[in-house]
């Protein structure tokens, strides 16, 4: 899955810290489910027959169930699937515990002795609108008619909302699913259709083939007005895309990418795909980005369906990455599954890393590992906070696992796997993964099982100890490099040492922060750092395992690169001599090395370890760097400075942006050229966005307004790679007419990508009155899956952030009712943009924001919001420094 799937706040309540697990006196073997959705009434009913093995003499059978009506329970000895003769049924009473989300089936007399039994019952429920469990997804078709799809999202613990079950990941079973498909509708599930019979009132009863043994959170069924593409045979696997009618022309990229992924993973893992079909299902309403249900992967439409002629390169890259991520889960997560929710990070981190490997094989020219550096930077940003957490931490209750669906799980987890792979070598790492999957297929594991398998291929490298230091404690180090003996006749020596990196020197008074065992900071003290140390220009790197004590390594003359290749998850601080050498050799560094040098410099500025003059010196060496990701660090830094600077100093930031960026836009031009590098469109878009907004380049903003007007009038179509940038600039300068035009395009989009692009641009508005209109739509018209992200974007925009914050204060209860529970905390990721201070250095908004959130946010989501509060404090402290440092940006221009 690409984002969270359960309410992070659900853990609050009377049960407190009690471990919430099912008794282990019985295990399921097989579920036979009949599911009958009624799309018109918004309800469903069903029948469950669960073959289970009772291991102990039991007074009750305890399963999970939530928001279900359960009737007619009975228990019979024997399993029909094993050919057992059915025994006499025993009647059962039902005791529901809503707080524990359990249903106890209690014999009316006696106990249940060990043996094989079949538990049967009927059940019913409501197709909810919360995008979890068995829920409704609604869209309006081309004739203006509202259409309803019934679909599922069960991770982490919402299968219990659809049918009674043993809803824990290690209680795997076979699922034999039958669905009553209304007339004119299509039903899909995890397995291929096996047979169907006509229903008396119209429609079909469709039975699907039994699945492999799998966890309940991977079960899926989707019913509605849908179409499926003809199946493509991929080495015996039937591949389809399922979509709403009229969108079949948008599936080619998905089919091509999935075809490649199935073959790539089969070869990489050395195991066949664990099934015979794979449906990729595009849904209008979906809280997560996508979900790895075995054989029936569900997606947001904009992350699956794309028109290549109207899709930017970066957008196509994202679509392929999500597809590759979910298909990787078919092996790593579905075939082999974590034992308990504390291990969900490994499923997601490994799928994130493998998606990069797969996509890099699919389109090497995209340089996806360089693209990933931007996402890794987000993880480093959170991990430099005292409110960070270990990647893996104890989970007593399933709902606590929801706090793991963040950049630390996905991006930090993937980054440390990549760091390990680069240190060991790809072949050794892959053989370890193959060993792990082969040994644990169809079973459940802990992370140490993977470390042991990789360690068996790693020689003397202490894999388990290295990974434990990165996974079981929060934070990351600043690796300091000091060059010794550079002026002597012998080879120079590089002295390496480490210390914890943090944006604030000490933890702030953060009422939302959790204190772990008396520790005020979630950042660890030292790590086993697998370093690759090389020279500028690609010298073969040395392997150095840096512990708590400093290490010295001989290096060749020239500029040393501590994070050679750029795969390490840490910051690097160079002494003045080493930094000067790297800047002199900047053009021969690899793209990731250049990215890291700029990003690490900016991070040390944010942390108060360096002044803006140091950043300006590094940025002046970018020259004509061709990589858009390197430039994105500079653009992001200047954008934040514009957000936080005193109003009187904002022209200085704008001038620095124009001096640095305008020569690059002149170099790449506005229009695609024959022979353009794959990176040029992304660079052009980033430059136009920055210059047309905080860069205050009037000619750029005027050109964007003209391009938008021509497209609205039907005179031209903006190039797909530039469309998002043009919209961002137009929204930044928008009046009522421009807002109306953007909303009209949002309501009648060309394709799902166009819808998202128009909606996202609204976060750039600067007129508070226009912002209020859009905020009102977030509670009515804008899909609940998208609204939290838009509000966060609006919070982070200087001119409308205060207006947006007042809206959040006034409407938070409504937002909590309407938005998916797993994404409400996303709203508050925008509050660091409220870090402005007055002339005396007093925060304009931060104190009231912190006070409100302390009283308004409850449960496990406080941990996530606490991180945003700490980022806000870091921005406040940066804002206090700016009057004294912004002049150091004066005259900034690239050296050539």
Regions found by a protein language model. Name each.
Residues 376-378, 495, 534-544, 549-896:
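Long, ordered, helix-rich scaffold segments
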Residues 1-45, 79-80, 144-149, 169, ...:
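N-terminal, polar/Ser/Thr-rich
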Residues 34-36, 92-94, 106-111, 162-166, ...:
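Beta-strand-rich interaction surfaces with strong enrichment in secreted/lumenal proteins
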Residues 49-68, 176-182, 497, 501-532:
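Surface-exposed beta-strand/loop patches in extracellular or lumenal glycoproteins
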Residues 67-141, 201-202, 549-557:
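A surface-exposed beta-strand-loop module
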Residues 13-23, 112-113, 120-176, 224-229, ...:
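Glycine/proline-rich low-complexity spacer/linker segments in large multi-domain proteins
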Residues 46, 152-157, 164-324, 353, ...:
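Hydrophobic helix-coil surface modules that form long, contiguous segments used
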Residues 1, 10, 149, 208, ...:
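Hydrophobic alpha-helical and helix-loop surface patches within well-folded domains
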């Amino acid at each position: 899955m690409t984002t969270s799937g359960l309410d992070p706040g659900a853990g609050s309540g009377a049960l407190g810290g009690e471990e919430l697990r099912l008794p282990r006196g019985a295990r399921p073997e097989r579920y036979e489910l009949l599911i009958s959705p009624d799309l018109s009434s918004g309800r469903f009913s069903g029948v469950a027959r669960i073959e289970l093995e009772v291991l102990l003499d039991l007074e009750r059978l305890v399963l999970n169930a939530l928001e279900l009506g359960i009737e007619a329970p009975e228990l019979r000895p024997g399993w029909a699937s094993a050919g057992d003769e059915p025994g006499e049924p025993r009647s059962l009473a039902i005791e529901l515990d809503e707080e524990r989300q359990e249903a106890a089936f209690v014999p009316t007399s006696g106990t249940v002795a060990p043996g094989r039994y079949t538990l049967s019952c009927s059940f019913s429920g409501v197709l909810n609108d919360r995008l979890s469990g068995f829920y409704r997804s609604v869209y309006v078709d081309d004739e203006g008619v509202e259409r309803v799809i019934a679909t599922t999202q069960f991770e982490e613990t919402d299968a219990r909302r659809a049918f009674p079950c043993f809803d824990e990941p290690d209680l795997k079973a076979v699922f034999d699913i039958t669905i009553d498909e209304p007339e004119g509708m299509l039903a899909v599930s995890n397995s291929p259709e096996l047979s169907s019979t006509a229903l008396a009132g119209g429609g079909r009863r469709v039975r699907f083939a039994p699945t492999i043994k799998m966890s309940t959170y991977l079960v899926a069924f989707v019913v509605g007005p849908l179409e499926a593409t003809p199946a493509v045979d991929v080495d015996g696997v039937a591949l389809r895309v399922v979509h709403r009618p009229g969108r079949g022309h948008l599936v080619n990229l998905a089919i091509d990418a999935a075809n490649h992924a199935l073959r790539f993973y089969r070869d990489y893992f050395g195991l066949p795909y664990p099934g015979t079909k794979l449906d990729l299902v595009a849904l209008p309403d979906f809280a997560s980005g996508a979900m790895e249900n075995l054989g029936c992967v569900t997606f947001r439409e904009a992350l699956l369906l794309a028109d290549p002629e109207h899709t930017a390169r970066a957008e196509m890259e994202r679509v392929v990455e999500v597809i590759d991520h979910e298909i990787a889960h078919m092996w790593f997560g579905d075939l082999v599954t974590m034992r308990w929710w504390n291990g969900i990070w490994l499923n997601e981190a490994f799928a994130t890393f493998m998606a990069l490997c797969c996509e890099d094989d699919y389109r090497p020219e995209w340089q996806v590992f360089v693209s990933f550096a931007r996402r890794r930077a987000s993880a480093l940003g959170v991990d430099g906070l005292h409110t960070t957490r270990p990647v893996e931490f104890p989970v007593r209750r399933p709902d606590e696992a929801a706090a793991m669906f963040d950049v630390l799980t996905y991006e930090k987890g993937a980054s440390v796997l990549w760091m390990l792979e680069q240190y060991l070598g790809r072949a050794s790492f892959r053989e370890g993964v193959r060993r792990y999957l082969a040994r644990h297929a169809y079973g459940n594991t802990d992370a140490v099982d993977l470390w042991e398998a990789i360690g068996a291929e790693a020689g003397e490298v202490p894999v388990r100890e290295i990974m434990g230091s990165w996974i079981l404690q929060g934070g990351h180090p600043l690796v300091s490099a000091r060059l010794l003996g550079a002026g002597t006749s012998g080879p120079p020596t590089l002295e390496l040492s480490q210390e914890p990196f943090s944006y604030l020197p000490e933890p702030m008074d953060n009422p939302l922060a959790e204190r772990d065992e008396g520790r005020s900071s979630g950042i660890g003290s030292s790590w086993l750092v697998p370093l690759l140390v090389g020279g500028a220009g690609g010298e073969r790197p040395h392997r150095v395992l840096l512990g708590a004590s400093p290490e010295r390594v001989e290096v060749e003359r020239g500029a040393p690169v501590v994070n050679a290749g750029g795969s390490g998850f840490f910051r690097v601080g160079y002494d003045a001599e080493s930094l000067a050498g790297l800047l002199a050799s900047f053009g021969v560094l690899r793209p990731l090395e250049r990215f890291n040098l700029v990003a690490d410099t900016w991070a040390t500025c944010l942390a108060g370890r360096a002044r803006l003059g140091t950043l300006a010196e590094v940025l002046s060496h970018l020259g004509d760097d061709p990589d858009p990701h390197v430039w994105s660090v500079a653009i992001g830094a200047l954008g934040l400075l514009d957000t936080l600077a005193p109003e009187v100093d904002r022209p200085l930031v704008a001038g620095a942006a124009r001096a640095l960026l305008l020569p690059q836009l002149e170099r790449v031009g506005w229009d695609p050229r024959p022979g353009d590098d794959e990176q040029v469109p992304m660079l052009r878009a980033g430059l136009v966005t920055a210059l047309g907004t905080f860069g205050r380049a009037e000619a750029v903003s005027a050109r964007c307004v003209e391009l938008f007007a021509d497209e609205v009038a039907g005179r031209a179509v903006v190039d797909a790679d530039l469309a998002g940038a043009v919209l961002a600039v137009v929204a930044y300068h928008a009046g009522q007419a421009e807002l109306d035009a953007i909303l009209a395009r949002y309501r009648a989009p060309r394709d799902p990508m166009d819808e998202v692009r128009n909606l996202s641009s609204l976060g750039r508005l600067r007129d508070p009155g226009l912002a209020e209109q859009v905020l009102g739509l977030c509670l009515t018209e804008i899909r609940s899956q998208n609204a939290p992200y838009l509000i966060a974007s609006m919070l982070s925009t200087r001119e409308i952030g205060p207006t947006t914050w007042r809206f959040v204060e006034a409407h938070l209860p409504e937002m909590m009712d309407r938005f998916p529970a797993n994404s409400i905390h996303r709203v508050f990721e925008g509050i660091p943009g409220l870090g402005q201070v007055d002339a005396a250095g007093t925060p304009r908004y931060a104190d009231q924001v912190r006070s409100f959130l302390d009283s308004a946010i409850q449960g496990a989501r406080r941990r996530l919001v606490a991180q945003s509060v700490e980022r806000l404090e870091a921005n406040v402290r940066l804002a206090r420094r700016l009057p004294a440092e912004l002049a150091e940006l004066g005259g900034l221009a690239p050296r050539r």
